[in-house]
Amino acid sequence: MSSLESPNSPPNLSFTIRSGAAASTPTKFSRSISTKEPSFSHFPYSPPRLSAPTTLSKSLHTSPLASPLHSLVPTKIPDLHSADYRCVSSVLKKDGQILSIAVSNGFVYTGSDSNAIRIWRLPEFAECGQLKTKACMVVALVVSNERVYAAYGDGKIRVWRRTSDHGSLKHIRLATIPKTGSYVRSYIAGKDKTQMKHTGPITALAINASDDILYSASLDKTVKVWRISDLKCIETIQAHPEPINAIVVADDGVLFTAADDATVKVWRRNFCGGDQPHSLTVTLPAKSSPVKSLALTQDGGVLYGGCTDGYINYWLMGWFSGQLNYGGALQGHTHAVMCLASVASYVVSGSADSTCRVWIREQDGGQHTCVAVLVGHRGPIRSITAFSGALGDDQSTEDGCTICTGSLDGVLKVWHVTCKSMIKSSSQSPARSVSEYFEL
């Protein structure tokens, strides 16, 4: 996306986007190996078409490495861990590229190049409304406590309150962040304007509902902290020396940020006050590849970071120490991992190689198995979300998940994946020694 691209991007290596009948003469596109955001907005691609389930490409990629060296050897997936999957819906609207997806309380929200956020009702996955503004390009979405937060290409965040009136879904526009009045007053008072508004495009949003906090990350290398109660900016974190691509918040309030400097940083909030309410606790290196996406398991035990080299690095939270230790890297994508999602024991990744991979995680988090490769998009997959179970009456098993993928080809796809045999439970795993939990 040109407006999300860092300035002065250097020439990059090339890669291929699938192009249907023209596969024999593929078109070349750029892949970033630098610390700059690759541009996807001008990608030519084949006209989207409805997809059918394809043959599963099987490969197992795990690593017990102590540091991110990526010396991984692909291993064939045994049939025991293969999955049944299919595309249950494929929708193309005249909105352009799909840039963001969020799911909450039976509704899916999708943002695109246009000025409309489309709302889809589950389980039938039928469109039931739109949220429109004068601004275009919805680059990030998050829904929490019946509020919808959307970041736009103009660097502002719009907020709606969701209500239900006799079964009819309604959204009431609440505010635009930063508020125009506050911005003008700060300007007149001679205050630093950068403390009010991002100076670059917003790339990600995250909510810490328990602390009444909204976070926004930007290509301007900062994370802004907004108090939800009055929608005021209360802090600007100079988080990275390079553009920030992704943020995620744990249930305990720990903030994770990922950037083009090939690191993931961990921040904690200081409730004692001071000039810096958020302090850096640790920096996690991801070799030399910019980190484009983040995902955290529901229990906060595993952190995933998708990189431009196609690897998904992951870190394990120590049971007793609380420290994050490098666990390995998942290999399979041939190009940048643009988005990640985690639900139950599933990890789902979307890539610039136009595929979505589904991984199963063992109970201890150390071993991962790729059980499905979802093929059908004609452009890079930019956004993804996943939730447990199936749509409608398709409740074949309890261990399945539903995945929504949004691509720069403008197509929104819905998939259902069912693992034939779940990974061994922790009760079947061999006992672990104390030395595995403590550094002795």
Where are these regions (language model features)?
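WD40-repeat beta-propellers
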Residues: I117-R121, I157-R161, A217, V223-W226, ...
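Canonical WD40 repeat/beta-propeller blade segments in eukaryotic WD-repeat proteins
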Residues: D95-I101, C136-V142, V184-I207, E242-V249, ...
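Terminal intrinsically disordered, low-complexity extensions flanking WD-repeat/beta-propeller proteins
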Residues: S2-S57, I172, T176-A189, E362-L440
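Short loop/turn segments immediately following beta-strands, especially the blade-tip
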Residues: R161-L169, R268-D275, L316-G322, I360-G366, ...
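A short helix->beta-strand "capping" segment at the edge of beta-propeller domains
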Residues: S71-K94, E124, S186-T194
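Conserved strand-to-loop turn within each blade of WD40 beta-propeller repeats
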Residues: G111-S114, A151-D154, S210, A217-D220, ...
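Structural hallmark of WD40 beta-propellers
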Residues: G106-Y109, E146-Y149, T203, D211-Y215, ...
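Short C-terminal beta-strands that terminate individual repeats in beta-propeller domains
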Residues: V88-K93, E127-T133, R173-K179, D192-K197, ...
